[in-house]
Amino acid sequence: MDIFSEILPLREQIKAWKREGKRIAFVPTMGNLHEGHLTLIRTAREHADIVVASIFVNPMQFNNADDLTNYPRTLDEDVEKLTAENVDLVFTPTPEIMYPEGLEKQTTVDVPVISTILEGASRPGHFKGVSTVVNKLFNIVQPDVACFGEKDFQQLALIRQMVIDMALDVEIVGVPTVREMDGLAMSSRNNLLTLNERQRAPVLARTMRWISSQMRGGRNDYLSLIEDASDQLRAADLQPDEIFIRDARTLQEPTEETTQAIILMAAFLGQVRLIDNLVVELAAASNDEEE
């Protein structure tokens, strides 16, 4: 496996593969890899001849300096895992490589509307940081296809929209969330939980499934449903941060025409912010007039 931290040698290798007619898949990560990331890698392998991964903790997408400082960095272990998965190349740039003039002078990519609603409303600038770094990585790696986890549902929607708006020639593949045996969505942040917190963490997924069952049973008083779910989280000493019920296609409020909804949840467990989501199939709305 090739490991590059500089842009130029990476580009030369990519060009060589392209000349050979190779199809290239890309998996951008922030490191601290777990089974969820490795599932992205395996999915990428199914879509291409060459798999490229990146490991870069992107400072532009962090609102909280402590969160950036405390984010787990395990480069040696990550490289071992990627080697075991037969990844062809890993790109490990520093902030100085990605942002040579500093964040203040970096040209940014801002996807309107979707970057400022839901999680974007409470984390201003976060999604601009995501879209900027992903766009830059796409320009560096020039992939044919890129794989992203559905756990970060709004992020996936943002990237799909950016690809459309910027006319990028990249196929975006969403990969279902990978979960622990107890239902907790796999995340690098899970490593920051204490043993006691880890035991309580699955309450987030259980509460989400409870909301889903209520919705599939016909309950549509969403504000009351969200408050009931918040109470369940508080009872387990989780602090609700965000709970949204939206149309899965538009990320707007559900309407009578909504047939597929998405539950988006975030809660603090101690100092760790956990996120999760679940798609809910609703009874199809009928617009047919009675004969």
Swiss-Prot record:
Which amino acid positions bind beta-alanine, per UniProt?
Answer: 61
Q: For ATP, which residues are the binding ones?
A: 30-37, 149-152, 178, 186-189
Provide the binding site for (R)-pantoate: 61, 155
Q: Part of which pathway?
A: Cofactor biosynthesis; (R)-pantothenate biosynthesis; (R)-pantothenate from (R)-pantoate and beta-alanine: step 1/1
Does the keyword field hold ATP-binding? yes
Q: Which HAMAP family match?
A: PanC (MF_00158)
Q: Any idea what this protein is called?
A: Pantothenate synthetase
